[in-house]
């Protein structure tokens, strides 16, 4: 289907738009009644590996909310299966790695990712969506540090002690792990673009655990290589992290056409720091649990803080939480659409 709404593509290029485009991280998920109904029939891996069902889930918020972009429904750990990682997605916990990568043997056991063989269902989902979507489709992948955190820790972590111990204690091995993950995610993202994704987002959900000095030494060179390898894909790339206020300048230097801001980052400060670089964000997801008067106030605050500058994609500072009322998400979209009314 030909795009009838290219607002997000124009904003990602820093071009003027009549209003900010709006979409939400985790816009297809447990807060939706229709999604919960599907989950009664399918597990998360079953949805992701069934292109027809996965396309249906990806389309849910486009139809229900009127957002300006769809984001491929998947998990950031999806490509790890194709690298030989034994993992499970545990409800209310997240990915659990049954063969954690903590030594040279574990790193060398990671296979090169061949997306067409390892995740053909992801690419077929994209092709289906491109026939049906009136708005751009965002493909995505986890950033190397965030994926390394899962692999080394064995699952979600709060203190990241194991991953930091490897990083500090065996630096050469750490860089080898990051090189493997960088190459794998570059292939994965390029394959998504070739299948039809209009934009890409790199999620570095846990990189805020690092100091700026550690980011520069242990992560930034790999992110630079990742973004350089994505240039031939010819689509805009969003670079997003959580807890990254102190890393934003380095993240900008590492690459990406758009910088995603979490809700702890003051928007005026970020825009001054980043100059002409387009930004995405950054409403606190918890605001969507509040009364509509508060939601309106906070949405208007963010729009005012942006000051009408080009290159602003409205989003949350993190993903929609499951407790969120659907009507409140729809209300945010309506508020943004009022800007151009």
Curated annotation (Swiss-Prot):
Homodimer. This is Uroporphyrinogen decarboxylase. InterPro entries: UROD/MetE-like_sf, Uroporphyrinogen_deCO2ase_HemE, Uroporphyrinogen_deCOase. Substrate binds at residues 26-30, 75, 150, 205, 318. GO terms for biological process: protoporphyrinogen IX biosynthetic process. Disulfide bonds: none annotated. It is found in: Cytoplasm. Its main location: cytoplasm. Keywords: Cytoplasm, Decarboxylase, Lyase, Porphyrin biosynthesis. It catalyses: uroporphyrinogen III + 4 H(+) = coproporphyrinogen III + 4 CO2. Its EC number is 4.1.1.37. The record marks 75 as: Transition state stabilizer. It is an enzyme of class 4 (lyase). Pfam families: URO-D. Belongs to the uroporphyrinogen decarboxylase family. GO terms for molecular function: uroporphyrinogen decarboxylase activity. GO terms for cellular component: cytosol. It comes from Thermus thermophilus (strain ATCC BAA-163 / DSM 7039 / HB27). Pathway: Porphyrin-containing compound metabolism; protoporphyrin-IX biosynthesis; coproporphyrinogen-III from 5-aminolevulinate: step 4/4. Catalyzes the decarboxylation of four acetate groups of uroporphyrinogen-III to yield coproporphyrinogen-III.
